[in-house]
Regions:
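Active-site PLP-lysine loop of aminotransferase-like
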Residues: 217, 238-256
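N-terminal Rossmann-like NAD(P)+-binding subdomain of aldehyde/semialdehyde dehydrogenases
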Residues: 1-100
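NAD(P)-dependent aldehyde/semialdehyde dehydrogenase
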Residues: 88, 260-310
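Short beta-strand-to-turn element immediately C-terminal to the catalytic PLP-Schiff-base lysine
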Residues: 224-227, 256-259, 290
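Residue-level signal for inorganic ion chemistry
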Residues: 16, 20, 133, 193, ...
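Short internal beta-strands
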Residues: 137-143, 255-258, 280-285
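Flexible, glycine/charged-enriched surface loops at secondary-structure junctions
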Residues: 15-22, 86, 162-169, 244-251, ...
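Rossmann-like NAD(P) dinucleotide-binding subdomain of oxidoreductase/dehydrogenase enzymes
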Residues: 81, 90-232
Length: 310
């Protein structure tokens, strides 16, 4: 597998921007054209998830619909529109003898990505790797195995249709945890490993991997409301950031408010958040502000702990 990925990486490293973009456009089109096949596989994952009593948030991350597939396809086309990073000059200088020295961006080679059970990440990861001229080996969450299998098949077929190597996108999902362990030990075969998920997953990979790791964040997205902010707009932003899709990793998790507007803003914002079913982990100042407010369900307010800020 890694030998095939290495050969595919060599091809992609020399591919033109036009060729790579054609591959991405083919992937975007195939996601829409083969939606029924993808959704049938996703239905298998969803049924298994419900049988295993997955939480509503995790099920929402796992779920695909035709609208979500169109959004994923649109995201691929947004990557097409991005400038090609390969060959970009980062910096340069001229030596005393007139020699021009430049630092340019080049593909890494073969990238391994280990991530949670979100099918859209399969497409995001594959598309970004292709755009940057890399081959990618994927290990998605087991809950999305059926969805990922079909999505990777769709991507590989799309690349083949425009003359790019299918082995630029591969998966070790069928090997389960053994596949993830093999990726972590593939020093020299995989050039960089990127974990995406919770702190436990990321820390385990950072500690155990023999392959260089690009460490990502674990979430805890912040929103800050300054004293000069438009409070109505801020309220709308926090509602969208938290309640649009509560289960995704970029949903807002920490709200910081300037003391000058805390009294006015927090009562209104927390009223809307708790009404929408959001439990508030409040510090002492916030609890003092909202305590006894008739518009706020007291059962939805719990004391914040140190771990809430991590």
């Amino acid at each position: 597998m890694t030998d095939a990925a290495r050969e595919a990486a060599r091809v992609l490293a020399g591919a033109t921007t036009h060729a790579k973009n054609r591959g991405l456009e083919a992937i975007a089109a195939a996601l829409v054209e083969r939606a029924d096949q993808i959704l049938a596989a996703n239905a298998e994952d969803m049924a298994r998830g419900r049988a295993e009593q997955m939480s509503d948030g995790l099920l929402d991350r796992l779920a695909l619909t035709k609208d979500r597939l169109r959004s994923i396809a649109d995201a691929v086309l947004e990557i097409v529109a991005l400038p090609d990073p390969v060959g970009q000059v980062v910096r340069g200088s001229r030596t005393d003898i007139g020699l021009r020295v430049t630092q340019e961006r080049v593909p890494l080679g073969v990238i391994g990505i280990i991530y949670e059970a979100r099918p859209n990440v399969t497409i995001d990861a594959a598309s970004l790797a292709i755009k940057a001229g890399n081959a990618v080996i994927l290990r998605g969450g087991s809950a999305a195995q059926a969805s990922n299998r079909v999505l990777i098949e769709v991507c590989r077929d799309a690349l083949t249709s425009v003359g790019l190597p299918a082995d630029a996108i591969q998966s070790v999902d069928e090997w389960g945890r053994a596949g993830a362990r093999a990726m972590m030990r593939a020093r020299g075969a995989i050039d960089a490993l990127i974990p995406r998920g919770g702190a436990g997953l990321i820390n385990a990979i950072v500690e155990e991997s023999r392959v260089p790791v690009i460490e990502t964040g674990t979430g805890n997205c912040h929103l800050y409301v300054d004293a000069s902010a438009d409070l109505e707009a801020a309220e709308a932003i926090i509602m969208n950031a938290k309640t649009q899709r509560v289960g995704v990793c970029n949903a807002a998790e920490t709200l910081l408010v300037h003391t000058d507007v805390a009294q006015r803003f927090l009562v209104a914002a927390i009223t809307r958040l708790t009404t929408a079913g959001v439990t508030i982990h409040a510090d002492e100042v916030t609890r003092a502000i909202v305590d006894g407010q008739p518009s706020i369900d007291a059962d939805m307010i719990v004391p914040a702990t140190e771990t809430d800020w991590e």
